[in-house]
């Protein structure tokens, strides 16, 4: 069952969950059907991530997805969600130019989608921008460690926060908390470093490839439930094999058509 006991989850419930030692659950969602299922299952937060560029639109990188595309997906998720807190990524190119640009992008997301918060990547360097968004009345989730929008400057998909760089991870996390973020995603960082950050902060930490010491976990649902039949990251645990099930179902459908057994009497008027 969910770690948060509420009919409608608000940002304050995440801080309360941390104080009470309750773990929180997060899944990505990009459409109404998956959002409804995950919401009814009891997930605490639904993240409309820019990972939609990969798992929905078939692109190689998250850098290409636009704010307009994110808004279309987020609208579908919020329409279907009654309980979970819906958070929407600000995609690459929508907040880096200036804090004013970031506030305008965040306002569009909130006004046009009905989401409860936005997520933004970056550490100390983005703290002022986060403060401006928060001051505009918009809740923010931060994202540090491996940040996919910075994949080229980081040298690819590599673990962050090892050795001496663990100090930067803590500094980034503190900066986001001081800027007003109510939660922060820690992606692909050593478990011990993530645990130290979690113990240092009063806001919620959400891990992805960051060990079991964070306040919660997030996975891309197509990875977690096996819709993606390709290679998956090491940190993914597969809870179902939906890709294989859909493949087999499609083959059965095709076979019934070729055999002339579908539709039958039960499916006819």
Swiss-Prot record:
Quaternary context: Homodecamer; pentamer of dimers.
Predominant subcellular localization, coarse grouping: cytoplasm
Record's keyword annotation contains tRNA-binding: no
Domain of life the protein comes from: Bacteria
Protein name stated in the entry: 3-methyl-2-oxobutanoate hydroxymethyltransferase
Annotated EC: 2.1.2.11
Cofactor note: Binds 1 Mg(2+) ion per subunit.
Any one Gene Ontology BP term: pantothenate biosynthetic process
Compartment(s): Cytoplasm
Reactions the enzyme catalyzes: 3-methyl-2-oxobutanoate + (6R)-5,10-methylene-5,6,7,8-tetrahydrofolate + H2O = 2-dehydropantoate + (6S)-5,6,7,8-tetrahydrofolate
Gene name tied to this protein: panB
């Amino acid at each position: 069952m969910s770690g948060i006991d509420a009919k409608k989850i608000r940002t304050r419930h995440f801080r309360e969950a941390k104080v009470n030692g309750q773990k929180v659950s997060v899944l990505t969602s990009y459409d109404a059907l998956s959002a409804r299922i995950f919401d009814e299952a009891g997930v605490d937060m639904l993240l409309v991530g820019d990972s939609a560029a990969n798992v929905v639109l078939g692109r190689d990188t998250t850098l290409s997805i636009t704010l307009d595309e994110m808004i279309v997906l987020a609208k579908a998720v919020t329409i279907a969600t009654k309980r979970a807190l819906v958070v929407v990524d600000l995609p690459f190119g929508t907040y880096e130019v200036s804090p004013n640009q970031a506030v305008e992008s965040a306002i569009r997301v909130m006004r046009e989608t009905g989401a409860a918060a936005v997520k933004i990547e970056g550490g100390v360097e983005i703290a002022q921008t986060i403060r401006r968004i928060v001051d505009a009345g918009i809740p923010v989730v931060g994202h540090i460690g491996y940040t996919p929008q910075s994949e080229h400057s980081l040298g690819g998909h590599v673990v962050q926060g090892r050795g001496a760089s663990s100090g930067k991870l803590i500094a980034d996390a503190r900066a986001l908390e001081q800027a007003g973020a109510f939660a922060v995603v820690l992606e692909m960082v050593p478990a011990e470093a993530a645990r130290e950050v979690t113990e240092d902060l009063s806001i919620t930490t959400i891990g992805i490839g960051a060990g079991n010491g964070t306040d919660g976990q997030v996975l891309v649902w197509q990875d977690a439930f096996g819709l993606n039949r390709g290679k998956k990251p090491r940190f993914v645990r597969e809870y179902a094999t939906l890709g294989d099930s859909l493949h087999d179902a499609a083959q059965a459908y095709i076979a019934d058509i070729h055999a002339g057994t579908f539709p039958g009497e039960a499916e006819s008027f």
